[in-house]
Amino acid sequence: MTFIDMLRGATARNDSLLCVGLDPEPSRFPAGLRGDAGRIYDFCAAIVDATADLACAFKPQIAYFAAHRAEEQLERLMRHMRATAPHVPVILDAKRGDIGSTAQQYAIEAFERYGADAVTLSPFMGFDSIEPYLAYHGKGAFLLCRTSNPGGDDLQSQRLASVDGQPLLFEHIARQAQGPWNRNGQLGLVVGATYPAEIERVRALAPTLPLLIPGVGAQGGDAAATVRAGLRPDGPVVVNSSRAILYASADEGFAAAARQAAQATRDALNAARG
């Protein structure tokens, strides 16, 4: 089954546009786990178990594991998600971007070591830095397009004078991803919820690509505006929330609180799509 098939299936089965981001910070763990990087797996597995029927995807951020030498815990978590929520796709948030030979190694890491269904990538180095991931037929790749951080304007909103129509950089990325780069229907785009007008612009340029949309929750993105701007019958959206769900409570009932926060976010997204 391809990533896009898994995504559509989980969206329908769980009636959800919500992606639960897994960005574990031991210093923010609840009492009993707080400060213990050896318990990253335990914390994340509890979140997964509490939200698996509410999510259309999970998105572990690799840096939050690697910073604590917890790659083996991430491998274990990936196995756990496969065993307990096999219908929910996993997007490895790695934002890799390097020359082809190095990209091939990163693709092995994402799809063979961790068994992810999709990965996030930086397209800054061009198509040959993306192509090795597309050799894994059925896997997905989300390209950074218009990101939610304020500094995204530094490059993404600059005009390309040498390209026909002088598009903004993020517009050019969207066109390339919808068109010549998307040879096997594996690409999607990352567009921040903090810029709903630009979500709408990206959707106009890439009408069928899945959009991974971070920034709802702690970053302040509006759920209803996000869905209205990005969702189309043939263009799915995957709306990520991480901290607002993970750290909904600092006590031993953190998993139940995470479930409550995830359900509230899912319901808000569903209300926006009607």
Swiss-Prot record:
GO terms for molecular function: orotidine-5'-phosphate decarboxylase activity. It catalyses: orotidine 5'-phosphate + H(+) = UMP + CO2. The active site is at 95 (proton donor). Gene3D superfamilies: Aldolase class I. Pathway: Pyrimidine metabolism; UMP biosynthesis via de novo pathway; UMP from orotate: step 2/2. Its EC number is 4.1.1.23. SMART domains: OMPdecase. PROSITE patterns: OMPDECASE. This is Orotidine 5'-phosphate decarboxylase. It comes from Paracidovorax citrulli (strain AAC00-1) (Acidovorax citrulli). The lineage of its organism: Bacteria, Pseudomonadati, Pseudomonadota, Betaproteobacteria, Burkholderiales.
